């Protein structure tokens, strides 16, 4: 996964560029 905004609201962009939230509460690591 490509981290977009690390550790901020657990938000990151997936490999398709879709903004998603990490349910694990990590820094974009899914």
From Swiss-Prot:
<dbReference type="GO" id="GO:0005576">
    <property type="term" value="C:extracellular region"/>
</dbReference>
<comment type="similarity">
    <text>Belongs to the sea anemone BBH family.</text>
</comment>
<dbReference type="GO" id="GO:0015459">
    <property type="term" value="F:potassium channel regulator activity"/>
</dbReference>
<protein>
    <recommendedName>
        <fullName>U-actitoxin-Bcg2a</fullName>
    </recommendedName>
</protein>
<feature type="disulfide bond">
    <location>
        <begin position="7"/>
        <end position="27"/>
    </location>
</feature>
<keyword id="KW-1220">Voltage-gated potassium channel impairing toxin</keyword>
<dbReference type="GO" id="GO:0042151">
    <property type="term" value="C:nematocyst"/>
</dbReference>
<keyword id="KW-0872">Ion channel impairing toxin</keyword>
<dbReference type="GO" id="GO:0090729">
    <property type="term" value="F:toxin activity"/>
</dbReference>
<keyword id="KW-1015">Disulfide bond</keyword>
<comment type="function">
    <text>Possible voltage-gated potassium channel (Kv) blocker.</text>
</comment>
<keyword id="KW-0964">Secreted</keyword>
<keyword id="KW-0632">Potassium channel impairing toxin</keyword>
<keyword id="KW-0166">Nematocyst</keyword>
<keyword id="KW-0800">Toxin</keyword>
């Amino acid at each position: 996964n490509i981290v977009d905004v690390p550790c901020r609201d657990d938000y990151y962009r997936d490999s398709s560029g879709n903004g998603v939230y990490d349910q694990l509460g990590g820094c974009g690591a899914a």
